């Protein structure tokens, strides 16, 4: 799978079977747009849209290439334990950072800790330095993330800061 960041809350994911776009409009699997809660499957990609605590936008759980991704666009509050269990085991977590419609640093750190993903990819940030410093991230930005299930970290969490292609 190849993940590219297109700025703000937008990502493009290329899998062996499909091109998937993530944005505030929802999940687009080659023209099949998912923007409401429910369970969907298209071209080897399954998506579960969860509505949490009356939020306007669903949190999306995406299963593809034997990996599970969580895309919580618009989430800006703490999750209770029951919701964290509902989200389940996540390999790759997209984290909305910042103040406007996303998560301040402390809330983002708690969200990451609660979900306990193997890989974290920040989004919606204007200044990433405070987050990098708080998490001890020394790696620079990368153009894209190319990853397979076998390459996921086992013992530690890995952070990837993707350069915006926009």
Residue ranges and their predicted role:
Residues 25, 123-125:
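Short secondary-structure boundary segments
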Residues 1-88, 92, 100-107, 142-166:
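Core dinuclear metal-dependent hydrolase active-site scaffold
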Residues 104-109, 125-146:
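Enzymes that bind and transform nitrogen-containing heteroaromatic metabolites
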Residues 74, 97, 124:
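A cross-domain feature marking catalytic cores of carbohydrate-active enzymes
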Residues 86, 113-114, 133:
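Solvent-exposed polar/charged
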Residues 91-92, 99, 107-123:
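Proline-aspartate-enriched helix->loop->beta-strand connector
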